[in-house]
Every structure is written in structure tokens, then in C-alpha cells.
């Protein structure tokens, strides 16, 4: 249970180390994360912090949500996100407080969650990296078919989870243990090593890494 940030994927670029090594990074805009509600065990049954990100026209906000944000004294947001945290950390925050990239530090490992790019209806070759059939030598109109999907009368059905054609992408994906390569505090940017799910402009959630990789040989 850790506090995180809501951000927007700006795109990918690269930075250079002092030794001249090139590092591919994804730029995340995490500006203007503001607290809209502090949930406690007494009032809500659990402890969490609700954060708003981005902006939205007042005409596009429902009256209940507009009242909720007005009560907190917070500008209308494009998205609301809850982070479950400990009670002592929640007590340090208040409605309207702004959370910035200083929540993290360079070298820290984080988990980044986003919605992957939708690819539409795809075959098994593109979707699951299946191999193609033979181009000739007896193969007739079966070059890209997946092959058999079942057995005989017993069991007489296709097992659940069978890899077949279908909708590809547009799924919630979490990439774990990405390292923060650089923090631009002035522009509220996080530069994360490697790729992040989603297209440019997509929303992402950045939280401290849950699973840390063990160092081989360490005691």
C-alpha cells in the first residue's frame, strides 16, 4: 500500500550517461496531482487517498462529482484515482494538497500501469506469434490457420484459454520494476527506463515497485 501518481505518457526519447551510454526512456507528465479526498477507516471502512489529475470542462462533469470536488476545493479533474496507503501517511495529507514527482527519487524502481494500444481483430500469428504453415508442397489455403483447436468426441469441447484469433490489445497492462532514470522537477516530468504501456497521451499510474528483484549472490 503506497501512494502513487497519475500521469500522461508524453512519448519516448533517450538520454546519455556521463560515460556516453544511451538509455531509452519514456517521458511521463505527472503534473498537477491534487488530493480530493482522504478516506479513513471511521468514515469509509478503509484508508486511502483519492487523487485528481488533468482538467475537464465543467459542462462535462456530473453534479454529484462537481459537488464532491467543490467540497474539497479542488479544480475539476479528467480522472480520479485511489491509492490505498497507511493511516499515518494519510494523516500527513489534506484536501487540495498537490503531489509532485518528488514523491520518487532517481534510481527507484516503480510499477507503471496503462492501457495497451488496441490492434483490433488479429490472427494467431500476430496475436500469439504462431508459426505459418508451408507455402506450398501440399498446403492448400491453410498457410496462416492456427491448426487443430481440440481433440475428438472426448472431451468434445474446446478448453478454456485456448489461444485463438480475437481482439488484440486495449487491455490494462502493468510493467513492473522500471527504473526512474531522471526527474525534471520544474516541468513535473518522470523519465523512466524502457517502454510503458499505451499510446502517446494515454493515462498511466505510477506506484513504487511491489516486487523487487533479488540481487544474485546477495545474502
Curated annotation (Swiss-Prot):
One of the primary rRNA binding proteins, it binds directly near the 3'-end of the 23S rRNA, where it nucleates assembly of the 50S subunit. Gene3D superfamilies: 3.30.160.810, Translation factors. Belongs to the universal ribosomal protein uL3 family. Methylated by PrmB. Keywords: Methylation, Ribonucleoprotein, Ribosomal protein, RNA-binding, rRNA-binding. The modification N5-methylglutamine is found at residue 153. InterPro entries: Ribosomal_uL3 (IPR000597), Ribosomal_uL3_bac/org-type (IPR019927), Ribosomal_uL3_CS (IPR019926), Transl_B-barrel_sf (IPR009000). Residues 133-153 are annotated as: Disordered. GO terms for molecular function: rRNA binding; structural constituent of ribosome. This is Large ribosomal subunit protein uL3. Part of the 50S ribosomal subunit. Forms a cluster with proteins L14 and L19. One of its GO terms (cellular component) is cytosolic large ribosomal subunit. Signal peptide: none annotated. It comes from Burkholderia thailandensis (strain ATCC 700388 / DSM 13276 / CCUG 48851 / CIP 106301 / E264). One of its GO terms (biological process) is translation. Pfam families: Ribosomal_L3. The lineage of its organism: Bacteria, Pseudomonadati, Pseudomonadota, Betaproteobacteria, Burkholderiales. It comes from the Bacteria.
Amino acid at each position: 500500500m503506497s501512494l502513487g501518481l497519475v500521469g500522461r505518457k508524453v512519448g519516448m526519447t533517450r538520454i546519455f550517461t556521463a560515460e556516453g551510454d544511451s538509455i531509452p526512456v519514456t517521458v511521463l507528465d505527472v503534473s498537477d496531482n491534487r488530493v480530493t479526498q482522504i478516506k479513513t477507516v471511521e468514515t469509509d471502512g478503509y484508508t486511502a487517498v483519492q487523487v485528481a489529475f488533468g482538467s475537464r470542462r465543467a459542462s462535462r462533469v456530473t453534479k454529484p462529482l462537481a459537488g464532491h470536488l467543490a467540497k474539497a476545493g479542488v479544480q475539476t479533474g479528467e480522472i480520479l484515482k485511489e491509492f490505498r496507503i497507511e493511516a499515518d501517511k494519510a494523516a500527513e495529507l489534506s484536501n487540495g494538497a498537490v503531489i509532485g514527482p518528488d514523491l520518487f527519487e532517481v534510481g527507484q524502481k516503480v510499477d507503471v500501469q496503462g492501457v495497451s494500444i488496441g490492434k483490433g481483430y488479429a490472427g494467431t500469428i500476430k496475436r500469439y506469434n504462431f508459426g505459418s504453415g508451408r507455402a506450398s508442397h501440399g498446403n492448400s489455403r491453410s498457410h496462416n490457420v492456427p491448426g487443430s483447436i481440440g481433440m475428438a468426441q472426448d472431451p468434445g469441447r474446446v478448453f478454456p484459454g485456448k489461444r485463438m484469433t480475437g481482439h488484440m490489445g486495449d487491455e490494462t497492462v502493468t510493467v513492473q520494476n522500471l527504473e526512474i532514470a531522471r526527474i525534471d522537477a520544474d516541468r513535473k516530468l518522470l523519465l523512466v527506463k524502457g517502454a510503458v504501456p499505451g499510446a502517446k497521451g494515454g493515462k498511466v499510474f505510477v506506484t513504487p515497485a511491489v516486487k523487487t528483484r533479488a540481487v544474485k549472490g546477495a545474502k
